């Protein structure tokens, strides 16, 4: 039986000239700017044009392009191998769909049709669900399938914030970095979100908190000094906090060894390689930090690949509703943006 796995990620510009078009795609997404097209399009043009110079400097730090596609391809290859080794009576093929740059859903659907699967599994590379990330990617894929009159049995793994293999992957990476440390502050850093999104029922912050809670329990370190914070704030809106930058400043002044964990990113990209590794380290150094360590994103970590593989193969064990498979976790009823509570 042929099965196609669609891996969703954000994407990133493949050269400096594509930074502004990438930003436009990001801000032209209704899940990011919830405005009518007639207003959203020109505003996305304006924002992307104004932010392009700073963003270009960031990508120049990375050699002129984002590494996210190459790294996602490595994850895709590892997952495809694991799936085919584990479930030998099925033929799995993984396809990458980026939301804001290539490869886009409109192009990838042609490759999926050529593969001619009997089943499609949608797997966001976002462990914690947000309408702005997983939700947007899933909707785009469904819209493209509808536009192309493509109807195949499709199942969705909406999120996996407390999956044990995912938790184990983070735990092991953290232990590698802290096993010989003393007087350190473990800072779990996730991408921020405007407070208004959470108030409208987005479960992202709650799910991030559940991930961190499980990892801390799994570490099982007495009197562990840890905190969850949020990075990458932009614009005038009030964002969820506390901010990672503020926490770094505070603990640098206390002469703590800073240990950063990117809890919501599973691939290295500008927010980890530049924001965490360069910009925040400079802030830490300027405030007296003597030691600064960053735990890597999970990438092709064996436990993370196992997590995705088992989520796909064993999905019927935690089936919530027709074609929707959350991993043994249900968001509280006030999070109306959660697909488990608002399933079509």
Swiss-Prot record:
Keywords: Cytoplasm, Heme biosynthesis, Iron, Lyase, Metal-binding, Porphyrin biosynthesis. Fe cation binds at residues 191, 271. It is found in: Cytoplasm. PANTHER family: FERROCHELATASE, FERROCHELATASE, MITOCHONDRIAL. Pathway: Porphyrin-containing compound metabolism; protoheme biosynthesis; protoheme from protoporphyrin-IX: step 1/1. PROSITE patterns: FERROCHELATASE. Its EC number is 4.98.1.1. This is Ferrochelatase. One of its GO terms (molecular function) is ferrochelatase activity. The keyword Cytoplasm applies. Belongs to the ferrochelatase family. HAMAP family: Ferrochelatase. Catalyzes the ferrous insertion into protoporphyrin IX. The gene is hemH. It catalyses: heme b + 2 H(+) = protoporphyrin IX + Fe(2+). GO terms for biological process: heme biosynthetic process. Its main location: cytoplasm. GO terms for cellular component: cytoplasm. It holds the Pfam family Ferrochelatase. Transmembrane segments: none annotated.
